[in-house]
Amino acid sequence: MKTLLLALAVVVLVCLGSANELGLGRQRVDRRRRQAVGAPYGLCFQCNQKSSRDCLNPKRCPYFHRTCYTLYNSGGQWTVKGCAKMCPTAGPNERVKCCYKPECNND
C-alpha cells in the first residue's frame, strides 16, 4: 500500500512539472522587472482597427512569441497590434514599433 502511494505521488509531481513547462500552470512574474518568468510566451495586445474592442485586455501569445509589436500606417495611426517571434518587417508606407515587455504595445 505504501509503495502504491509513493508511486502515485511521483506521478503527480511529474505531471505537475510537465504542466508548468507547457505553460499550463500558474504564470510567475518577476515583480522587479515586470516580466513573465518561466514559460516561453509573451503577453501582448492583439487586435486591428476593426476589432479594436479586443484591445481592452492583453492576450497570451503562442509559445516563443515574446515580441509585441504595433504596425502603423503612413498617417501615423496604428492598424495592427500583435505578437511575433521576431520583430516583423514593415511594408511600404508602414512603420513597426516593437517592444519586449508584457503588455508594452498598449499605445
From Swiss-Prot:
It comes from Spilotes sulphureus (Amazon puffing snake). One of its GO terms (cellular component) is extracellular region. Residues 1-19 form the signal peptide. Monomer. This is Sulmotoxin 1. Residues 20-34 form a propeptide. Expressed by the venom gland. Its main location: secreted. One of its GO terms (molecular function) is toxin activity.
